[in-house]
Design a protein with these regions (language model features):
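Short S/T/G/P-rich N-terminal loop/turn motif that feeds into the first structured element of a domain
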Residues: 18-239
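Sec-dependent signal peptide recognition
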Residues: 1-8
Length: 239
């Protein structure tokens, strides 16, 4: 059943020995569409279209059984005029994602003609899930940042550090989700290696999670270990 939510070996110097990763990332595919509302349309129209599309197209086949939709509305960012909303489609694999795209191309014409938005950017990504919030999900919130690793550091090392950080954070009451997102075709070019996603099952929990970080996690050994691998994170935005 499609879910709709409102609201991505190191060689040792001189030794040439392989270093095993502490954790094995589980990758999934995700498609991000930045949208502008057509004249006279708003978020309610987009939400209604998504629900209607589920009923009239997606539910008619098992191709979308593992497909999940998330809608974002930008709240904080450097340019809130760039787009009005983001449609995120989550898939377990590239095979399922492109099978879904193929079905939509062949069978989604009538629904596509009624879409209340124009797409201004479409990005194909891979995502590594680090942690996920527990409990029933409501209207949530997500913070994105473009991050660059220090020279000589690879993504698996950063993932290991994020996992250790998330495990330690949970012991302090943290209930936030985290992902490393690797943008592909359609991505905005820039000096970054991945996009970091920090998300909460409710808007309020993103705020309480931030307070918990500064009170209980900042400066911990896991926090320092993570910072030792990351050169910088920038272009923070919240939806």
């Amino acid at each position: 059943m499609t879910k709709i939510l409102l609201t991505l070996s190191l060689l040792l110097s001189g030794l040439v020995a392989a270093q095993e990763n502490k954790y094995e990332p589980v990758a999934n595919k995700a498609e991000y569409y930045a949208l502008k509302y057509l004249p006279g349309k708003d978020y309610s129209d987009l939400k209604d279209w998504v629900l209607e599309n589920q009923k009239k197209v997606l539910s008619k086949t098992d191709v979308y059984d593992n497909f999940e939709v998330v809608l974002f509305s930008p709240q904080f960012g450097s340019d809130l005029t760039a787009h009005d909303a983001v449609f995120l489609g989550l898939w377990p694999s590239a095979t399922e994602m492109y099978k879904g795209m193929g079905y939509w191309i062949k069978n989604g014409g009538s629904q596509a003609a009624k879409i209340p938005v124009a797409t201004v950017q479409a990005v194909d990504t891979w995502q590594w899930a680090i942690s996920a919030p527990e409990g029933e999900r409501d209207i949530g919130a997500v913070r994105f940042a473009d991050c660059k690793m220090k020279e000589g550091v690879n993504s698996n090392q950063v993932f290991d550090a994020y996992k250790d950080f998330a495990i330690a954070a949970k012991k302090t009451g943290d209930n936030l989700g985290r992902k490393m997102i690797f943008p592909g075709p359609g991505a905005t070019e820039g000096d970054y290696d991945y996009v970091y996603s920090l998300y909460a099952r409710t808007v309020e929990e993103l705020g309480s999670g931030a307070d918990n970080y500064w009170q209980n996690i900042n400066g911990s050994k896991e926090d320092q270990a993570l910072n030792d691998l990351i050169e910088s994170c920038s272009n923070y935005r919240i939806s």
